[in-house]
Amino acid sequence: RTTYPDARVGVVDLEGRLVMPGIIDLHTHMRDPGLTHKEDFYTGSRACAKGGITTFFDMPNTQPPTVTAQALTEKIAQAARVSAVNFGFHFGASKNNNIDEIRRVIGSGQARSTKVFMNVSTGLMLIEDTALLAEIFKVGGLVFVHAEAEMIDKAIELNARYGNGLYICHISSEEEMRTVIKAKQNPALHNRQHPIYAEVTPHHLFLHTGMREASAEADMLLRMKPELKAQSDTAFLMQAIRDGYVDTIGTDHAPHTLDEKLAQLTFGIPGAETSLALMLAAAAKGNITLPLLQKLMSENPAAILGLTHKGVLAKGADADITVADTAVHWQLGRKDIVSKCGWSPFEGWNFIGKNYMTIVNGNIVYRDGRFAADLRERPAGRFVFQI
């Protein structure tokens, strides 16, 4: 402990709490622009702050999709006006061939990654042309892929032949993870020039098909891409985390309103508010260690995208800090949810551990259930790639 007699220095007593580098979520869908009845940069960033996330990266499948430099510039400007936490963006690859736009954006430094959909998901961004995919891998920086089943093999091959790095989003099954493990063990496929990064989401760790099949309502609510898998798959994914084959936990925060989910088959669920709590509960049960949690949620995401001043608690680093109560027992209720969609698949769940405080660029934006009073007028978030 250090005593600061200078009244200008704010002191926060965090004894007994877990203090870690701010959580970085590399996989969100903030629905802004075009789908802001589901979420927007203001409400989504508040959900992040409540969940302990100090930096989010947003995916390009909005309306319109982020497949031009102009669209990306507009998203950056909108987020800068309202975001409670730091933000970055993945540029989108288009089936209509936007190679020149990809070159321009990656070259300018506005984005360091390109998202490629190799399977169908929300938005019309599926790319099946192998020649076009090869060009995207050549110029797209770190390529984030939505790839399922055999498409993972294809993405790994494209990265080895043409790419500069491959980030495989939301791996959901034992079969897919075994494919990734095999590739990571092969130095011809996974090396410094062509690295492979593996992401797993909390919902693929803690939800399974048995839960979805429990009722007609659950069968509508618990739908996403990739779909939930068997309980044996969730166990294998957790073991892969412990074995060091998983690099990050990404939420794939993809909210839809409750009415939309119950009215028609709609893929995606909210996750920003609950990801840390779910992982803390896993740590409390002995499934993972707290140092591993910090590596998956803070250190590795920063390193993967070259955020050299984030992901660490050190002199000169950005003052992005997540503080958690690791022993508190609590239950999630609908009244607790701040995401605009207003619901969570984890309502009624009992947790051990939750976010206590979120500090963004030295500003306390969330503390023990309350947001900073001036968060709307003075948003704390900054664009992570200052040009």
Protein language model annotation of sequence segments:
Residues G16, H27, C48, G52, ...:
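Divalent metal-coordination and catalytic microenvironments
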Residues E150-K154, L158-G163, R242-D243, D247-I249, ...:
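His/Asp/Glu-enriched, well-ordered alpha-helical/loop segment
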Residues L14-V82:
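Metal-associated gating/positioning segment near the N- to mid-region
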Residues R1-P21:
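Histidine-rich, glycine-flanked metal-binding segment
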Residues A77-A93:
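A glycine-rich helix N-cap at a beta->alpha junction
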Residues H29-E39, T54-A69, F89-D100, F117-L126, ...:
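Divalent metal-binding segments
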Residues D100-I249:
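Histidine/acidic residue-rich metal-binding segments in metalloenzymes
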Residues K315-V384:
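C-terminal cap of metal-dependent C-N hydrolases
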